[in-house]
UniProtKB/Swiss-Prot annotation:
Identification of the protein by name: UPF0102 protein BRADO0179
Family annotation (SUPFAM superfamilies): Restriction endonuclease-like
Region spans: Disordered: 1-24
PANTHER family in the record: UPF0102 PROTEIN YRAN (PTHR34039:SF1)
HAMAP family per the UniProt record, alphabetical: UPF0102
Organism expressing this protein natively: Bradyrhizobium sp. (strain ORS 278)
Residue stretches of biased makeup (Low complexity): 10-19
Gene Ontology molecular function: any one: nucleic acid binding
Family under the similarity heading: Belongs to the UPF0102 family.
Length: 141
């Protein structure tokens, strides 16, 4: 049986929201984790291997980093009430933070720098299948 945190009855080492978070923030955190799990499952079903989840840098966070053959995809996961709302939630400012975080990840993993790189988004909404937008944005200025 997997080891659990006795205080929360969750798997040991699972990310936890801040202790002072409001109920709304806790709900958003859990929704995000669920959306990221659905997105990772979709990528795995499509033949990707997940290299990293929730990769954090001072520049920003990348929800998922996945590889399929000679391609590395940096994936932003957005969960909203509708897929259209999720699509509009990936702002230019956020795109730049993801690009900066991807550069930091590549510095730490130089063996992946020569592969094809792509910035994807996976949109998640209730009662809908997740939508994978390949090349949702690029690093070009």
């Amino acid at each position: 049986m997997a080891e659990t945190d006795r205080a929360t009855d969750k798997p040991a080492g699972a990310p936890k929201p801040a202790k002072t978070a409001s109920p709304e923030r806790v709900a958003a955190f859990r929704t995000g984790l669920s959306a990221e799990a659905r997105a990772a499952a979709l990528l795995i079903a499509k033949g990707y291997r997940i290299l990293a989840k929730r990769f954090r840098t001072p520049h920003g966070e990348i929800d998922l980093i996945a590889r399929k053959r000679g391609l590395v995809a940096f994936v932003e996961v957005k969960a909203r009430a509708s897929l259209d709302d999720a699509a509009y939630a990936v702002t230019p400012r956020q795109q730049q933070r993801i690009i900066d975080a991807a550069q930091a990840w590549l510095m730490a993993h130089p063996d992946h720098a020569e592969l094809e790189l792509r910035f994807d988004a996976i949109l998640v909404a209730p009662r809908s299948l997740p939508r994978h937008l390949m090349a949702a944005f690029d690093a070009s200025p």
